[in-house]
Amino acid sequence: MASASTSKYNSHSLENESIKRTSRDGVNRDLTEAVPRLPGETLITDKEVIYICPFNGPIKGRVYITNYRLYLRSLETDSALILDVPLGVISRIEKMGGATSRGENSYGLDITCKDMRNLRFALKQEGHSRRDMFEILTRYAFPLAHSLPLFAFLNEEKFNVDGWTVYNPVEEYRRQGLPNHHWRITFINKCYELCDTYPAPLVVPYRASDDDLRRVATFRSRNRIPVLSWIHPENKTVIVRCSQPLVGMSGKRNKDDEKYLDVIRETNKQISKLTIYDARPSVNAVANKATGGGYESDDAYHNAELFFLDIHNIHVMRESLKKVKDIVYPNVEESHWLSSLESTHWLEHIKLVLTGAIQVADKVSSGKSSVLVHCSDGWDRTAQLTSLAMLMLDSFYRSIEGFEILVQKEWISFGHKFASRIGHGDKNHTDADRSPIFLQFIDCVWQMSKQFPTAFEFNEQFLIIILDHLYSCRFGTFLFNCESARERQKVTERTVSLWSLINSNKEKFKNPFYTKEINRVLYPVASMRHLELWVNYYIRWNPRIKQQQPNPVEQRYMELLALRDEYIKRLEELQLANSAKLSDPPTSPSSPSQMMPHVQTHF
């Protein structure tokens, strides 16, 4: 797994590597400048430092800090090292050493990042060098604590496509065949008065009035009532999402909620029961009763079957990822790799999430039963399960644009707390709300793409760039906790969408082996034998680990596709030229244009 150490270590994100190859993303390409800059990006300061590289030792360099990134360029002739770190990636900045520190390179800054790497810089003790760099980094990495805007609100990039137009909720519901005689679209939440963390348009049973919805909302955590996420195109079974019922220790009941779930059940005439998947371990669901929550009991919900999926909470997932980071950065212990990976429990959690989503998809497709999914508040594990199940069931979501719509719909519009889970611009790195829930979802998607290499239009780079900009604060896509907050901040007017960047250069993110198959259901194998650590993401910063290179067959196939496209373009140009000649009035019976055959392409 390990390869020989190299003296040239480039710690770039995938996106920053693309900056050097293309100007489509709007980066300043002036090679006389020391640091690449986006429109709206300004240089704040620069300073000579010693970068304590965990792989090659101390390297003298100059660090540049802008209002968007930390950029380090090596000053040593035998090193081509460049570090390019968006400030949004930084989780914590700590001072290293004190005034009495005498060890070599023992005085400086330690920087912890959200993307599985740490940085250490040694600075001179005189001239307040460390203090100045610490204060500037803290100010721009954590702008919310200093009444400064996130960089997304300063970014002036322009693209030839508008990513904000990718998702239109009503159009997406119409694609699914909604509304119909069982389901209607309501705008009761237009002003976010019913539920401030739900989107404005909701799909609910046709027989449920808006007054019914208001009464049901009083019995669901955060007023997150059961609403439709997806409907099967043939058997018309549905996936419905919500939060936990407010049962409490006394076992409270709510006739309106019970009746509402019955109405949902009755939209499906094939099965007499509604299947409820509670994402939590049963012991946690019982414990939630102490804080007013709970689950649907058999006594209250006679026509429902309840299953617990044993997926752990945000705190367990956060600690698990910390353990992954400990074993992959900076060094990988080859001799204890398997036991170390097992001790993180990360792949066990991936397995449980995938297993739960498979159960949801199978129950809807093969079991012909409508399904209701919830966890506690319905914005973490619930989003994982519904979106993964929809990805398995609906081939549309496996296209580039379809996946963007899936993320916009099930995660962004339905209130996954991105600001709280990621901590955009927030210095409180110990916040208990931080958790890698969305990363876990993307990891599950990657696991599926490994098992079904022709089923997804997008490639691995597509997934990695989404994760890179989950943290970067360059785009407005993942900012804030819910749709109502984004509307208040006018995010779609004042920021650029990540989908603008991706969709303006789609070829870069396409899987050359993609085969479009409509209505094919994917059932990944969620066993530990078939799951693996995503090396190209989690261990990409370590130059000693041999990254998984593109398959030579894949590379050749992409070259042939490019060649085919070039030939098609040239043939089309010939056809246009030929058509123009044929439309000209003949100059003589033996005009060459009359004798030229019409060129056709058989591609």
Curated annotation (Swiss-Prot):
The keyword Membrane applies. The keyword Membrane applies. Its EC number is 3.1.3.95. Coiled coil: none annotated. One of its GO terms (biological process) is endosome to lysosome transport. Residues 14-25 have a biased composition (Basic and acidic residues). It is an enzyme of class 3 (hydrolase). Allosterically activated by phosphatidylinositol 5-phosphate (PI5P). GO terms for cellular component: cytoplasm; filopodium; late endosome; plasma membrane; ruffle; sarcomere. Residues 163-538 form the Myotubularin phosphatase domain. Its main location: cytoplasm. Heterodimer with MTMR12. Interacts with KMT2A/MLL1 (via SET domain). Interacts with DES in skeletal muscle but not in cardiac muscle. Interacts with SPEG. This is Myotubularin. It comes from Pongo abelii (Sumatran orangutan).
